[in-house]
Design a protein with these regions (language model features):
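Soluble "head" domains of membrane/secretory-pathway proteins
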Residues: 1-125
Length: 125
């Protein structure tokens, strides 16, 4: 949904579509918002903490093996979002410098429907 974020801001748990660093030549990335502007994020002992509290995962995810940049606390600026892929140990996301924190202007829209193999289709939470 390309219009959703014209009227509201992304929330933790939202699945967004974006182009890293606004690169129009890049393919689209689909990742889950973990933290929003003003939040502080750190990954320790394989778990995500936002503002000092354990992040409440809405899906089953593996313990994180590589905290990347989030080994040290990251404070999000006014227009930044911290995103992670649901496949935590095989995902290019905000933990890595080539993706980093996502600026709102780079967000293309909100994902709302999944199409996969037969039986793996449906609306996203």
């Amino acid at each position: 949904n390309q219009f959703h974020y014209f009227f509201s801001d992304p929330n933790p748990g939202d699945i967004i579509v974006f182009r890293p660093n606004g690169n129009e030549k890049s393919h689209y990335y689909v990742r889950r918002v973990i933290a929003v502007p003003g939040d502080k994020v750190i990954i320790k002992n394989g778990a995500v903490y936002v503002n000092g509290k354990l992040y409440n995962e809405t899906t089953d995810v593996a313990s994180i093996e590589d905290a990347g940049l989030a080994v040290d606390e990251i404070e999000l600026k006014e227009d930044e979002y911290f995103v992670l892929g649901d496949n935590r140990n095989n995902s290019e996301d905000s933990r890595y410098a080539n993706i980093g924190n996502i600026k709102k202007e780079y967000i293309v829209g909100k994902a709302w429907f999944r199409i996969g193999s037969i039986g793996d289709m449906g609306f996203l939470d």
